[in-house]
A protein has these predicted regions:
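Cell-envelope and extracellular/periplasmic
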Residues: 1-202
Length: 202
């Protein structure tokens, strides 16, 4: 839906050769995650659907299906802004110096704190984050031409990042357990990998 022509495509596209499955974005395996998994299913690309499909995966699948004239099924398993370490199990991380460095940094930042403590910090973070977003939205509504420096001067810088902890989607070795392994062993012909942007500065 965020692609340049996304809204027009969502309203009009109808491709019987392309299906997609969205793995529920869950960083903790709890009752909510179990219910989300039970409700998830394959969808065919048709008008009004695929709003939540990865744009990269959508355009790739559409072109591939037309090129080889064969049905294409895309499993969307991603979480924007995450490190590659979120999608690697701890054994793989511990096997390299780079992986060990991520684990050490995570622990130094308080990643091993009790779950309840992390949950309280996470809830408090989102109260602050949502309030900041609401202030920004109001500023943009009142002054459509306002610049980001002016916004930051008025409401302060964005309070991102969320706290680290045992339920954080950004923790090393987390999403591979709560997302990737939930769709294994699916039979895959290929993989599109474009996670890991968070690692570019590290």
């Amino acid at each position: 839906q965020n692609a340049d022509e996304g809204q027009d495509l969502i309203a009009a596209h109808d491709d019987p050769l392309v299906h997609y499955f969205n793995v529920p974005k869950k960083s903790v395996w709890d009752d909510d995650a179990i219910a989300a998994e039970a409700a998830s299913h394959w969808e065919r690309v048709r008008p009004g659907y695929a709003r939540d499909m990865s744009a990269v995966a959508y355009f790739f699948a559409r072109k591939l299906a037309r090129t080889i004239d064969c049905p294409i099924g895309i499993i969307d398993c991603y979480w924007g802004g995450t490190s590659v370490t979120c999608w690697m199990d701890k054994e793989a991380l511990e096997a390299t110096a780079e992986g060990q460095r991520y684990i050490t940094r995570y622990r130094e930042q308080g990643g091993d704190k009790p779950f309840d403590q992390w949950r309280q910090e996470e809830d408090a973070f989102w109260v602050e984050m949502n309030a900041w977003n609401a202030h920004v939205a109001q500023l943009k509504k009142d002054n459509p031409g306002i610049s980001w420096p002016e916004i930051n001067e008025t409401v302060g810088p964005c309070p991102w990042h969320p706290p680290v902890g045992p339920g954080s989607p950004y923790r090393p070795g987390g999403l591979i357990e709560t997302m990737t392994k939930r769709v294994v062993p699916a039979t895959l012909t290929g993989i599109l990998y474009y996670q890991g942007e968070d690692d570019t500065a590290k």
